[in-house]
Structure formats: C-alpha cells, structure tokens
Amino acid sequence: MAAQKDLWDAIVIGAGIQGCFTAYHLAKHRKRILLLEQFFLPHSRGSSHGQSRIIRKAYLEDFYTRMMHECYQIWAQLEHEAGTQLHRQTGLLLLGMKENQELKTIQANLSRQRVEHQCLSSEELKQRFPNIRLPRGEVGLLDNSGGVIYAYKALRALQDAIRQLGGIVRDGEKVVEINPGLLVTVKTTSRSYQAKSLVITAGPWTNQLLRPLGIEMPLQTLRINVCYWREMVPGSYGVSQAFPCFLWLGLCPHHIYGLPTGEYPGLMKVSYHHGNHADPEERDCPTARTDIGDVQILSSFVRDHLPDLKPEPAVIESCMYTNTPDEQFILDRHPKYDNIVIGAGFSGHGFKLAPVVGKILYELSMKLTPSYDLAPFRISRFPSLGKAHL
C-alpha cells in the first residue's frame, strides 16, 4: 500500500486537450492529480498542437450540439481565468447542394435547439462571399456561434491552470507499464506511481496502453496533411473581411474545411477531413508521406472554389487523427477494471468538445453519475469487443 503522500487520487496519461481538460476538472475539485506526458511540452506529435481549431454548434448529432452549449461556457471560463483571448467568433458557413441530407439534418438540429443560424440562398452567398466560387444549386447554412479556438494558447492556459490548482504535470515520461488493481500502478521511464483511478487519453497511442490490459479498441490512426494556401491579395480571406470558417459538404468523400487567415500572415488553412493510415511512431518517415492524394484533392478544390488563393499549398504540416468506425468518441470505463477510464477515438472533431469530455472523464474516474447520456460513447457499441478479449 502506497503512503498517503505518494498516492494520487487520479493519474491522467496524455497531456493533449482531452487529458488536460480531464486534469483541469479533477484539480478544480481538489483532487490530487498527476498528468503524465511522454513527450516534452510543447510538442507536435499528437492531435492537439497547432494554432487553431474550429468551434461550432452545427452538428448532425443532437447530443454533440447539447454538449457544445456547456463547452462554450467552460471555454469562456478558462479564457477569463487565463486573462487571454482563446476564442474568436467568426461564424461557421456550411456549404452544400440544396438537397444535401446532411445539411438539412444539421439545420433541423440547430432549429430544434434554438441555435442562432441563417439559411443562405445561392444569390445571398454570392453577395456576401464573392471570393467563393459556388457550383450551381449550392446553398449555405451559417452557424453564428462558430469560430476559431486558439489551440496552442488553450493548451498552455490549461496546463498553467492545472499547476495553479495544485496538480502536477510531468512531461518527458513515457508510460511503460500499467498494473491494475484496487490501486493502479503506473510505471514510466522515470519511476512508478500509484493512484486510486487512472484515465487514459493517449490519442493514437491508446491501444499500446490497452493491449496489456486485455482489450483493444477499433481505432484507426491517420496522418492528416494540414495545408495552408497563400492569398493572392493579402487579407482577402481574413477575419477583417468578415470571412467565416467553412465546412463544405458533399463535394468529396470527406468534408473539406477552412479557417480565415491568421496563423501565418497571408495564409489560409484549408484541409481535408481524412488522411492516410500511419503508425504514430512512424508518421514522418519518408514511406509514410508517399500518398498525397488528399493534397491533390485540395489543390483542385482551391483552384475551382477559392479563386483568390494560389492553388499550391505554401505550408503542409502533420497531425494525427484517431478514428472510431462510427467517428463517435469512446468515453467509458474499462470493462474489467472500473477504476481505469478510457477517453479515445476523437476522430478529428474532439478539440472543441474537450471541456465537456474532460468533465465526463472526471465524473467516470470519481464514480459520479455522468452529466450526459453516454450511450453513444460506450465501448459495448462495438460487438467485436466481447469477453473473449478480456
């Protein structure tokens, strides 16, 4: 039995946005919390780095829209505590053909949940956004709540807040062994720790930690090319021109999204919501970078629809997605060890939802009643994960 001073209420593995918000909620509730990160902070090896992410209430699934109501409140609270701007409201423009079922469902969801939005005809789109070239029959849905989260600033603010609340953040410590039990023992490259509860938010490394615990999630790890495109006239796609974030539906097998210029002067982020299979340990090997089909898709898209951008990317960065088969999150306890909690499979859309995800993982780790219905996020929805894996 660990001495009381060496015993943590909870250990969180992974200091990306989900792990940081989990540790933040634990520390807010005065729990003795240790946040472990295998890389030295800050780093760009996972899914939470970079300067910006889209924030929105526009979702196909009504449960995400409900969660986003509270997410906005917690983002604002963190912004107030940090004393720095973490969010900018720009609006989010969803584009698609008038008959696009996804667009119709999102609009119905926004109406049902009384989220302020506008439906824009082709003519209205041309008048408001003349530097978008639209196919015939294309319409728009503007989610007024949409905008940009300053990702790196948010991570730094969270890590500072965790420390100020008495939590401990230890980076450069890779977890090499987890021993379950009434107390969970976590062994890193530096030392061993014990805790009453363990939360695993390890992104594309999740299954490496779970396999020795007798379970493997159906997770697909992808390397994403995050592309930036140069404006021909600086500022033409900027916030100063009231240009919004956008999400284009139905043109390709996966969505194309964009954010107004800001991260790099004169460059606009436009990326494809998909990528190539990649082991997170090998994502930057030359062999992992041979397939640039998504960049070619984007070049064609930019040439055809964003005429004031040069159609060759000026900057290409990498990011990891960890996708589930249905692209919904995994927020659940280990089927055998109820003091081990798993947060995984954020499928490229988890950053904005992290304030509530962290709250849910905190509640699960402390054996509290979750604030939300977790049916969409249960491990049991994957029938292949039966008792044979345990």
Swiss-Prot record:
It catalyses: sarcosine + O2 + H2O = formaldehyde + glycine + H2O2; L-pipecolate + O2 = L-1-piperideine-6-carboxylate + H2O2 + H(+). Its EC number is 1.5.3.1, 1.5.3.7. Keywords: Acetylation, FAD, Flavoprotein, Oxidoreductase, Peroxisome. NCBIfam families: PRK11259.1, soxA_mon. The lineage of its organism: Eukaryota, Metazoa, Chordata, Craniata, Vertebrata. Metabolizes sarcosine and L-pipecolic acid. A motif (Microbody targeting signal) lies at residues 388-390. Expressed in the liver and kidney. Its cofactor is FAD. The gene is PIPOX. Belongs to the MSOX/MTOX family. GO terms for molecular function: flavin adenine dinucleotide binding; L-pipecolate oxidase activity; sarcosine oxidase activity. Disulfide bonds: none annotated. GO terms for cellular component: cytosol; peroxisomal matrix; peroxisome. It comes from the Eukaryota. Binds 1 FAD per subunit. This is Peroxisomal sarcosine oxidase. Pfam families: DAO. InterPro entries: FAD-dep_OxRdtase, FAD/NAD-bd_sf, MTOX. The modification S-8alpha-FAD cysteine is found at residue 319. The modification N6-acetyllysine is found at residue 126. Its main location: other. It comes from Homo sapiens. GO terms for biological process: L-lysine catabolic process to acetyl-CoA via L-pipecolate; lysine catabolic process. FAD binds at residues 9-39.
